Amino acid sequence: MNAADLGNTIISAEDSTLEWDRAGTETAATGVEVIQAVVKRLPNAPGVYRMVNTEGDVLYVGKARSLKKRVTNYAQGRGHSNRIERMIRETATMEFVVTRTETEALLLEANLIKRLRPRFNVLMRDDKSFPYILLTGNHPAPGIFKHRGARSRRGDYFGPFASAGAVGRTINSLQRAFLLRTCTDSVFESRTRPCLLYQIKRCSGPCTREISVEDYATLVKEAKDFLSGRSSTVKAEIATAMQEASQALDFERAAIYRDRLAALSHVQSHQGINPQGLEEADVFAIHQEGGQTCIQVFFFRTGQNWGNRAYFPKADPALGHGEVLGSFLAQFYDDKPCPRLILLSHPVEDQDLLAEALSARAGRKVQVSVPARGEKKDLTDHALQNAREALGRRLAETSSQARLLEGLAETFGLEAAPRRIEVYDNSHIMGTNAVGAMIVAGPEGFVKNQYRKFNIRSAEITPGDDFGMMREVMQRRFARLIKEQGLPGNGSEAEDSDASFPAWPDLILIDGGQGQMSAVRQILDDLGIADLVTAIGVAKGVDRDAGRERFFMEGRPPFTLPPRDPVLYFVQRLRDEAHRFAIGSHRARRKKEMVKNPLDEIAGIGPGRKRALLHHFGTAKAVSRAAVEDLMEVGGISESIARLIYNHFHESG
């Protein structure tokens, strides 16, 4: 049973044969009474438990070797930290599931924490997917590509890389070394002569048979071997081939091998610190300071440093290095492949259990260790130094951000420094492909996982009507917010320091003047929340020069700020970020419209048939010229579908 299966077998206390006592959460004693009632019915077996409040929100997810013994600790009612006391006080009911082993419990716990994001657990933040290198496996001439997201495409994946830039640089060097194609399948099928990449020796030209199928397959195998960690073997084979070509006086071929070797050396030398004898490992280091935590991760694959990334998990300051790092690791590898070796700067709780769980997930042995000396210790020390520096920068930025937010509150007459600021902007060209954008900022800077874009879709909006677009954006944003979160102050958002990032904004900034503000105010009035949200319009001066902005607020005449006011610079940064995001979203939508395939307009042609047609004919234009009989030669295209396609392209003729 894997974590995904376990995640679907959660036993609710109300749905099981046990009758769970429900109690209020007004006092700490009430919470203890609920837990004491649950303990009587818990088995002495491994499993996972969930603590739930009166609203049905999961407060905490925990695992246990023995559910009964673990939950009994909460029933004592005394001797707990403030965090645990608050959690117990809010607990209205508990749910549990029994697992076969403690390893399964650990995997399930990590799965549930990532999915449910309980307020009292250690939580990963900024968990963007990592980019990988993909060698496609469903084509006679596999290509090499950058890939991010679900691994739905057949092929071999290599990574993770810390950034898209690292992937791009590596692919660029691998093109020089292995001459693999990077074109799409449709472009590959439509080529009649080699492209520029062939001319500059970045591709071997399999599209026009400039290389045999067998020789290209050899290049693909060498690339796989290199990316799989057998770089020394690959380089030795190429060096041998270069020597043989040189001895045969085939100096042109020897020069090709020489250039390939140089490209491989560039891949390995360009990645910074590259330890000897460490083919595949992840290095984690944790540093805690000022109530915050930084975990620095370095990725080593094929003996190369593929980059690093800093994480700042949400954790109770009272928790130690081991507990935070252990919880982080379980969540980190919940949806990522594990390397064979994981090096840590600090020991973690249940380290052997963690290694066992990761081994079970990977299907092979995964070693988790804290090196005490040697080159591996140097790696963890290097990662720890990076963690210290990253957290130092973050603390400095947070302090500066806090001062700016306090200044913002004073300037605009807010009751307190805003915890959540939303900034709105629109982008379009003559009303086409109109997009509304919302960016979010808070005490820790921009919160990019909260950004939202709104494709303007109302048929009643006149093209170019910025006020109408803003009304639609406001209506959709706040109507949905009310539906999902309720009104602010009704208890839907936790009020203690462990609360997650607030859903309701304390302040909204609109890129526009009085007209935009009137549109926004109309929607807020219609929804009955005009008194709950402070809205400010930010308009550029007559000459649209930065520094001459005019501000519009309800109940105040338009006003300006001194040119060198730090709050003015801060507002400009917020507005510019919203503008950047709006323009980027608009360009993406416009690009999507521009590359829209004519086959998308034919009813009955889904992704599978579209892919088969393009693979057979190469381009949509070639499909449009094909006869019915030619179309029927494509797998999955019946006579009726072939006539449908033919008629679509010839109906006006």
From Swiss-Prot:
Keywords for the protein's UniProt record, in alphabetical order: Cytoplasm, DNA damage, DNA excision, DNA repair, Excision nuclease, SOS response
One biological process term in Gene Ontology: nucleotide-excision repair
Superkingdom as given in the UniProt entry: Bacteria
One Pfam family per UniProt: GIY-YIG
UniProt GO MF annotations: DNA binding; excinuclease ABC activity
Major subcellular location class: cytoplasm
Domain UVR: 232-267
Cellular location(s): Cytoplasm
GIY-YIG domain segment(s): 44-122
Gene3D superfamilies referenced in this protein's UniProt entry, alphabetically: 5' to 3' exonuclease, C-terminal subdomain, GIY-YIG endonuclease, UVR domain, UvrC, RNAse H endonuclease domain
One CC-aspect GO term: cytoplasm
N-terminal signal peptide: none
Function in brief: The UvrABC repair system catalyzes the recognition and processing of DNA lesions. UvrC both incises the 5' and 3' sides of the lesion. The N-terminal half is responsible for the 3' incision and the C-terminal half is responsible for the 5' incision.
Subunit note: Interacts with UvrB in an incision complex.
Family according to the record: Belongs to the UvrC family.
Name this polypeptide is given: UvrABC system protein C
Organism expressing this protein natively: Chelativorans sp. (strain BNC1)
